[in-house]
Amino acid sequence: LMARMDNSGRNGDLLKRAKAKGATTTVDVFAGSPDDMGDVAGVLPHTDYFMPSIEEARALTGLTDAGDVARTFLDLGVNCCVLTLGADGAYYHHRDGTRFTVPAYQIKVRCTCGCGDAFNAGFAVGLVKGFDPETIVRFAQATSALNATGLGSQAGVQSFEHTLNFMKTTPVRG
């Protein structure tokens, strides 16, 4: 979601229609300040999974703590907030009270271009495959980590099976 791409509410309308048809909705955002919150807030009530980076979420809310940031978005209507934390992993906070942090994998980073998009793609795959929430986030983390091992967006991502094997064989940080 980029404010310059839609300041007329069309994104919110699209998500509302998708939800009415039974779709699961995910939203990522490109935002730089609390001034962008008005545009973002219009889509949140129609969002199942809101997945900004911690930097984007902090810029929107002015808050620093991941739990506080996530609760702000839950209060604005999302069902679940998943914050990517870079080298610190990812934080999952669902409206039902489920919350956890998944650590990042130990990798040699070559390029972080597209890591957020790779995380979101891995998350969507996990949803479609019916994984439990923690496995979904771990799979998303693995997809993002593999992306970072290559030079350029998606260079390190090979296949679903390769990503599952990476999850099983690669240690996590911390």
Annotate each PLM feature.
Residues 17, 34, 66-174:
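Conserved phosphate-binding/catalytic region of the ribokinase-like
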Residues 1-71, 89-90:
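Conserved beta-alpha-beta core of the PfkB/ribokinase-like small-molecule kinase fold
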